[in-house]
C-alpha cells in the first residue's frame, strides 16, 4: 500500500447555460522510497451528479412567481381594507349583522337571529383548523433546526427560505378564508364586492385565482434543501393535506354553481408551467408542484358544486399522500448509503432490486401511467371535468400530464440502468482522525456560509459522501491518503480506488502512474 500526499486547488469556471462548475487540479508528492506520481489533466472536472431527489424548484421559476404573488397579495389587502369597511357600513344600514370589517383574516362567525348554534360551531371549527394548518405550515423552522443540529444540511439561507415559504403559505390559506364570508342570511359576502344571494353565482376575483395557482409553486419543500429525512416527509406532506382540506370546506359554502372562467384560465397556465418547468427541475419537487396544480382543477370542480369533483379531490389527495409516503420511505431507508442525489440512484437495481422496483413504480404512478393508482386519480379527475363542461381544461391537463411523464421517468431510468459514478478514495488506516475531521469541518464551514442549494459534486473519503456547494470555494487542501489502487476508468475522468490486488497497481488511461 502506497502512502501519498495529494494537494488540491479549487477554482470556478462558468459554462454556458448549464451554470457554474467547480474544477479541481491535483498534484502529488512522493514520500521516502515510495515513488508514486498521480496527476490529473489540467482542468479535470468532477462528474455532474444531477439534482437532488427531493430538491426544490429552480430559483429562476420560484422568485418571479413568488414576488409577483406576494406583491398582488399586499396590494389587494390594502384595497380590501377600504372596501370591507364600506361593505360592512352598507350592511349595517340594511340591518344585516356582520362581523367587524377591521378584523382581518377571520371567517365571519357573527350570528344573526337566523343563525343556529350548529352553524356557529361549524365556523369555529373551520377557523381553528385553518389556524392549525397555517401554524403547521409555519412550523417548518422547528423541523429544519432539527436537521441542522443533526448535521444533515446547513445553509445561511435558513431565515430567508423559511420566511419566504411559510409566509406565502400562511397568506394563501388565510386569504381564502377571508375572501369568502358567510353571514346569517346564508349569503356569500365577497370582500371585492357587495353581498351576493346564494342563488347567483359567486364572483371569483382576479387576485384570488392568482393566489391559488401561482402560490402553489411555494408549496414545494424548498427550505429542506432536499434532505431525505422523516422530518422533511412530515412537514412537506401534512401542511399540504391540512390546507387542502380547509380549502375544500370553505369552497363548498362558496360555490353554488359558479362558472369560474378566471380560475380555468390560471389553472391551465399553471399546468403548462409545471409541465415545462419539470423538464428543468430533475427532482421530486416538480411532481409536488404538478399535483398541486391538478389540485387546482379539483377545486374548480368543487366550486362548480360537482359531486364527482369532490370525490375525485378526496381520492386524489389520498393517492398522492400515499405516493409521497412511499417515496420518502424508500429514500429514507437508503440514507445509510448516502442516497441524496439523482446520480446516487445509479445501479440501485443491482444493490437493492426491491427498493429500485418499488421506487420506479411509485414514480410511474406520479406520472399517471396506467394501470397505477396515479392514473386512476387523474382519469377520474379528467372525466369529472368533462362532465362539468370544462372541455378546454381537461385536454390541457391530459397533454401536460403526458409531458410530465418525461421528468418523472428520469429517476426510474437512473435507478434501473444508471451507473453509480463517484469520485472516491476509500479510507485507510493511514488517514488520521484529526485530518479526517478537519477536512469534514472545512467543507461544512464552507457550505454553511452559502445561500444556494447543495452542489452536484462529491468526494468520498471514508465510505461516505462529502458534498461541496454550487458556489465558489477557493483554496488549497492537503490530504495524506493511503492509495490502494489507482483508477481503472478514465471515461468520465473520475478517480476510483478499488480493493487492493496483491502485487498490482492499476492506472487508467489519461493518468500517469509510476513505481
Curated annotation (Swiss-Prot):
Lineage top rank: taxon: Eukaryota
Subcellular location: Mitochondrion inner membrane
Gene Ontology molecular function: any one: NADH dehydrogenase (ubiquinone) activity
A cellular component term, taken from the record's GO annotations: mitochondrial inner membrane
EC number: 7.1.1.2
Recorded topology in the membrane: Multi-pass membrane protein
Coiled-coil positions: none
UniProt entry keywords in alphabetical sequence: Electron transport, Membrane, Mitochondrion, Mitochondrion inner membrane, NAD, Respiratory chain, Translocase, Transmembrane, Transmembrane helix, Transport, Ubiquinone
Membrane spanning residue stretches: 63-83, 250-270, 299-319, 356-376, 379-399
Swiss-Prot/TrEMBL catalytic activity: a ubiquinone + NADH + 5 H(+)(in) = a ubiquinol + NAD(+) + 4 H(+)(out)
Any Pfam family matching the protein: Proton_antipo_M
Similarity section: Belongs to the complex I subunit 2 family.
Summary of the function given for this chain in its UniProt record: Core subunit of the mitochondrial membrane respiratory chain NADH dehydrogenase (Complex I) that is believed to belong to the minimal assembly required for catalysis. Complex I functions in the transfer of electrons from NADH to the respiratory chain. The immediate electron acceptor for the enzyme is believed to be ubiquinone.
Name assigned to this protein: NADH-ubiquinone oxidoreductase chain 2
Native source species: Beta vulgaris
Amino acid at each position: 500500500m502506497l502512502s501519498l500526499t495529494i494537494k488540491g486547488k479549487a477554482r470556478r469556471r462558468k459554462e454556458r447555460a448549464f451554470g457554474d462548475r467547480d474544477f479541481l487540479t491535483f498534484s502529488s508528492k512522493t514520500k521516502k522510497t515510495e515513488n508514486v506520481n498521480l496527476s490529473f489533466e489540467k482542468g479535470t472536472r468532477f462528474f455532474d451528479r444531477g439534482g437532488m431527489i427531493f430538491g426544490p424548484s429552480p430559483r429562476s421559476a420560484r422568485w418571479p412567481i413568488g414576488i409577483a404573488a406576494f406583491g398582488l397579495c399586499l396590494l389587494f389587502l390594502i384595497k380590501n381594507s377600504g372596501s370591507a369597511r364600506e361593505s360592512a357600513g352598507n350592511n349595517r344600514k340594511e340591518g344585516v349583522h356582520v362581523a367587524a370589517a377591521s378584523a382581518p383574516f377571520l371567517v365571519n362567525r357573527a350570528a344573526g337571529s337566523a343563525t343556529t348554534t350548529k352553524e356557529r360551531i361549524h365556523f369555529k371549527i373551520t377557523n381553528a383548523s385553518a389556524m392549525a394548518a397555517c401554524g403547521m405550515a409555519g412550523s417548518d423552522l422547528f423541523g429544519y433546526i432539527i436537521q441542522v443540529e443533526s448535521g444533515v444540511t446547513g445553509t445561511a439561507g435558513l431565515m430567508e427560505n423559511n420566511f419566504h415559504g411559510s409566509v406565502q403559505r400562511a397568506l394563501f390559506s388565510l386569504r381564502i378564508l377571508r375572501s369568502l364570508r358567510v353571514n346569517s342570511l346564508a349569503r356569500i359576502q365577497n370582500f371585492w364586492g357587495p353581498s351576493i344571494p346564494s342563488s347567483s353565482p359567486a364572483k371569483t376575483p382576479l387576485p384570488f385565482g392568482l393566489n391559488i395557482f401561482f402560490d402553489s409553486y411555494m408549496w414545494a419543500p424548498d427550505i429542506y434543501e432536499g434532505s431525505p429525512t422523516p422530518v422533511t416527509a412530515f412537514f412537506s406532506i401534512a401542511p399540504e393535506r391540512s390546507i387542502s382540506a380547509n380549502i375544500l370546506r370553505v369552497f363548498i359554502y362558496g360555490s353554488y354553481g359558479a362558472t369560474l372562467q378566471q380560475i380555468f384560465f390560471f389553472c391551465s397556465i399553471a399546468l403548462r408551467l409545471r409541465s415545462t418547468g419539470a423538464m428543468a427541475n430533475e427532482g421530486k419537487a416538480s411532481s409536488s408542484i404538478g399535483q398541486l396544480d391538478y389540485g387546482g382543477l379539483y377545486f374548480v370542480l368543487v366550486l362548480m358544486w360537482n359531486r364527482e369533483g369532490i370525490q375525485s379531490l378526496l381520492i386524489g389527495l389520498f393517492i398522492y399522500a400515499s405516493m409521497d409516503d412511499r417515496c420518502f420511505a424508500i429514500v429514507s431507508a437508503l440514507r445509510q448509503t448516502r442516497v441524496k442525489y439523482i446520480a446516487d440512484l445509479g445501479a440501485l437495481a443491482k444493490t437493492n432490486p426491491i427498493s429500485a422496483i418499488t421506487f420506479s413504480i411509485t414514480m410511474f404512478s406520479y406520472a399517471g401511467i396506467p394501470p397505477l393508482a396515479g392514473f386512476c386519480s387523474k382519469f377520474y379527475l379528467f372525466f369529472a371535468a368533462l362532465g362539468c363542461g370544462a372541455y378546454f381544461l381537461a385536454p390541457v391537463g391530459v397533454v401536460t400530464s403526458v409531458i410530465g411523464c418525461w421528468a418523472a421517468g428520469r429517476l426510474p431510468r437512473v435507478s434501473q440502468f444508471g451507473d453509480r459514478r463517484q469520485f472516491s478514495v476509500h479510507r485507510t488506516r493511514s488517514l488520521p482522525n484529526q485530518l479526517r475531521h478537519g477536512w469534514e469541518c472545512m467543507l461544512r464551514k464552507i457550505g454553511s456560509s452559502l445561500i444556494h442549494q447543495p452542489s452536484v459534486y462529491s468526494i468520498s473519503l471514508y465510505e461516505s459522501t462529502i458534498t461541496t456547494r454550487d458556489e465558489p470555494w477557493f483554496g488549497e487542501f492537503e490530504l495524506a491518503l493511503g492509495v490502494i489502487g489507482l483508477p481503472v476508468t478514465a471515461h468520465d475522468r473520475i478517480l476510483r480506488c478499488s480493493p487492493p490486488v496483491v502485487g498490482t497497481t492499476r492506472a487508467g488511461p489519461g493518468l500517469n502512474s509510476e513505481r
